[in-house]
Amino acid sequence: MSSSNACASPSPFPAVTKLHVDSVTFVPSVKSPASSNPLFLGGAGVRGLDIQGKFVIFTVIGVYLEGNAVPSLSVKWKGKTTEELTESIPFFREIVTGAFEKFIKVTMKLPLTGQQYSEKVTENCVAIWKQLGLYTDCEAKAVEKFLEIFKEETFPPGSSILFALSPTGSLTVAFSKDDSIPETGIAVIENKLLAEAVLESIIGKNGVSPGTRLSVAERLSQLMMKNKDEKEVSDHSVEEKLAKEN
């Protein structure tokens, strides 16, 4: 192992602010109900539809990421503007498939039944898989389990649906009747494609929340630039130290 690798320190946890979206507050960091890892707020936005000329908001969505997402994404995407990232399909695919934990908090603005919510989510997931040519029996069974988890649930305004996506591909589902986040989930589905598709259906190319997509792009653009600047300062300090030692 080289001396530079031996001296490398873990990336600092990103310092971010909370976000207020349509009277819903997303705190700067949360503990994942799947792993208890701290995750930072990557972005937030609304999901709504234009109904008879009026934009109706159904849910407000926050996306949280593990701290190592920033250096991982920085390798390819640092220096890109918010606009460039927002328009980049590969960038959001890398977030969706990246080897770091993700967490999604979906807070209700209007009441929804579990059946209404889960059927729409799985419909979007299946559309993504078919587009990618990835729909198999395993995914069909994962969809059945997903629908079963939600079948008897109802979600009044202010309640939340929570998803934790592990780097290994499991999807942990949890529910909250208020703003709290439970320490553990109520069910785990071991299907990597389903876990990824749930997130992609929100922030991907045809995702249901363009506002969340824009928010994630804006925040990560800033964080990657900050990470780049800090790394350059750190590298310069190491070079100075080595020069003095020699």
Curated annotation (Swiss-Prot):
The keyword Phosphoprotein does not apply. The gene is CHI1. Induction: By light. This is Chalcone--flavanone isomerase 1. It comes from the Eukaryota. The record marks Y117 as: Important for catalytic activity. Signal peptide: none annotated. Mostly expressed in siliques and flowers, and, to a lower extent, in leaves. Pathway: Secondary metabolite biosynthesis; flavonoid biosynthesis. Part of the biosynthetic pathway for all classes of flavonoids, a large class of secondary plant metabolites, many of which are brightly colored. The lineage of its organism: Eukaryota, Viridiplantae, Streptophyta, Embryophyta, Tracheophyta.
